[in-house]
Amino acid sequence: MNIKRKPEWLRIKLGEGRNLNYVKGLLKKFSLNTVCEEANCPNQIECFSKKTATFMILGSDCSRSCGFCNVSHGALQPIDPNEPENVANAVAELGLKHVVITSVTRDDLADGGAQHFADVVNQIKSKNKETMIEVLIPDFQGNKEALQKVVQSKPDIINHNMETIPRLYPEIRPKAEYVQSLELLKNVKEMDPEILTKSGVMVGLGEGEEELIEVFKDLRGSGCDFLTVGQYLPPSTKHYPLKAYISPEVFERYKEEALKIGFSFVASSPLVRSSYNAAEALEKHEEMKS
């Protein structure tokens, strides 16, 4: 397959965009960032049109520069003390039933921004009693005390993405550690078994199928409940190069394998991103329990 030419299954239908400007205006009003825009997510038009967004806290610049990521890594900004309340107000104004909170990585902060995550969760809960809260967190450099702050705020889901297979970490996530990320997910379950955990991987980076299945097994071994698998799309020619477009049939096979391994929900298709249709995983989990 010619990897320079995007296959048909990755061509996005723009759909209805009547709420796009409304959501963007709301974000500007509350001085908020979304990972949808910062990471140039292929689903942002659809999600904005449904009046949903994944809020990105702790500024718009990251302390790391992972090879796959489009988030900028310039001068790090002071934490905005009004951000927790602003996020909570935006959630209320949008009427969200499920909100995802993520962040840039802030290795410059003593707790990696963990207390700020907790403050955001608590503010959302105070103003939006029925909203389900998912946090997509960095690794906090393995700091268990920092992780405990997030866990104690009791979000419904804690997500931490593995991103790729361990062999590719030196190129894709040079400042992260594969085992440390697995330990984070395991530690969440040890700290609070009621919190659901989630992780995501990208494909098309040069991974082998057997290597990917081993990551699935490692994640389940760490107690991970939900899994997302999506196609890597390089943001620019300066980012890590695309090695392959993965067909929808292979994504379906990955989903079947992951479900056999024991995940309670798997989203696996070319345009899946870790926050895309995030509420669906929780709905499926509740159905399985009932």
Swiss-Prot record:
Residues 48-264 form the Radical SAM core domain. It catalyses: [[Fe-S] cluster scaffold protein carrying a second [4Fe-4S](2+) cluster] + N(6)-octanoyl-L-lysyl-[protein] + 2 oxidized [2Fe-2S]-[ferredoxin] + 2 S-adenosyl-L-methionine + 4 H(+) = [[Fe-S] cluster scaffold protein] + N(6)-[(R)-dihydrolipoyl]-L-lysyl-[protein] + 4 Fe(3+) + 2 hydrogen sulfide + 2 5'-deoxyadenosine + 2 L-methionine + 2 reduced [2Fe-2S]-[ferredoxin]. Its EC number is 2.8.1.8. Pathway: Protein modification; protein lipoylation via endogenous pathway; protein N(6)-(lipoyl)lysine from octanoyl-[acyl-carrier-protein]: step 2/2. Binds 2 [4Fe-4S] clusters per subunit. One cluster is coordinated with 3 cysteines and an exchangeable S-adenosyl-L-methionine. One of its GO terms (molecular function) is 4 iron, 4 sulfur cluster binding. It is found in: Cytoplasm. [4Fe-4S] cluster 2 binds at C62, C66, C69. SUPFAM superfamilies: Radical SAM enzymes. [4Fe-4S] cluster 1 binds at C36, C41, C47, S275. Its main location: cytoplasm. Pfam families: LIAS_N (PF16881), Radical_SAM (PF04055). Coiled coil: none annotated. The keyword Metal-binding applies. SMART domains: Elp3. This is Lipoyl synthase. The lineage of its organism: Bacteria, Bacillati, Bacillota, Clostridia, Peptostreptococcales. The gene is lipA.
